[in-house]
Each structure stands twice: as structure tokens, then as C-alpha cells.
Amino acid sequence: MRIIAGKYKGRRIICPEGKTVRPTSDMVRSATFNILNNIVDWENANALDVCCGTGAFGIEALSRGVKFAAFIDSSREAIEATRHNLAKVNEDPAHYEIYSNAVENLPAARRQFDVIYIDPPYSAGLVPKALKSLREKGWLAEKPIIIVETGEREKIIFPPEFEVRDERRYGNTKLLRIKLV
């Protein structure tokens, strides 16, 4: 896996072996950032990588110039991989935080996030819980841009204050752009 663009372009990042982390393919990550590039002012945004796995989304956002990124995962292997990958690109620790929490048990937010990528284990039912927790704990900016990665056949019932604005398929992966209404 490599960082696609920005100051860390071409840098390799690691993924833990085994089945605890399912990394987003470079193709899907590239498609995600192609969508976001048209609607995000990277230099004035904070990015949140939920169920971060390797931290690839947040590191890619840092590479493209976000002010700050946060990473959330409950897997010890994912947190270790994310720490390793951030150290590997030599990112300044003042520009990120890592939370080893389950999405249902988040602390109150220290800041709000403009761009949120949620990539839980497929069919785990975590997306509605994550959205509810992020909203209730103050993690979402006033008009956040939320991307959810799911399996192509997964059906998600979103909380009523969220609606799907765009849906795209890439192989067996589906990307949903969600709006807070």
C-alpha cells in the first residue's frame, strides 16, 4: 500500500498480517479522494479516520494538507499499524491524535471534524452506532462530509438525521457520501 498524493506521495505503509484489519484498496482510496477533492478545502479541514485499520485515510489526508487528523480503532493491531505508519512518514504528533476506543464508547470531542471516513468491518452493524456516537459526543463539524465504506450488498439503516447523498461501487466495495440533515 502506498500514499497516493501530497507530501507523502509514494511512501509505503504497512498492514498487519491476519484478518483483523481489512485495508481499503489503493483504487478505492484514490476514488474517495477524487470525490473529496472537489468538495474539501484540505488546508482548512480536520479529518477523522474511524475504524482506521492502517490509518491510510487519515495519513492520506495529512499528506494532502489537512490541519489535523484523528484516528479511531478498537483493534490493538490497527492502532499499532497506524502508529507505525505515522512514524514512517514522520508526521508531527502535534497534527494528530489516536484513540483506541470502540465507536460506541467515544470520549467527548476535543475538536470537530469536517471530513470523516468510516470503514468498519463489513456487516458488523457499526455505522449507525458510529454516526450516533460521533454526533452526540460533538465530533462532527456543522456541515461534515462523511464517507462510509461498506460491502456492495450491505444494507445500512441510517439514523434519521443522516441521509445518503451519493453512492458509488468499486468491485465489491460501496462508498456512500452521507449528509447530516
Question: Locations of the language-model features?
Answer:
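Class I S-adenosyl-L-methionine-dependent methyltransferase catalytic core
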Residues: 1-181
